[in-house]
Amino acid sequence: MGFTDETVRFNLDDSNKKEISETLTDVYKSLNEKGYNPINQIVGYVLSGDPAYVPRYNNARNQIRKYERDEIVEELVRYYLKGQGVDL
């Protein structure tokens, strides 16, 4: 697949937003309870796709794997921009 100079639209289904947010919160709590740095572990998972960054504790690994990594990134960006006062 070649690259183009044209801007490509990237669209994801909005129906999972709340569920992804809740899942990230649950995974964060599980990582914290196990003594990991939750931010580092979640970033490691999102960048690599390696589920070993998230423990099985409290079913955290299975929870986060329900979503594609691009869906998780989209929710993180949306949450950040809303926090910066951007009207989405």
UniProtKB/Swiss-Prot annotation:
- Name the domain of life: Bacteria
The UniProt family comment states: Belongs to the UPF0297 family.
Name this polypeptide is given: UPF0297 protein SSA_2241
- Tell me which species this is from: Streptococcus sanguinis (strain SK36)
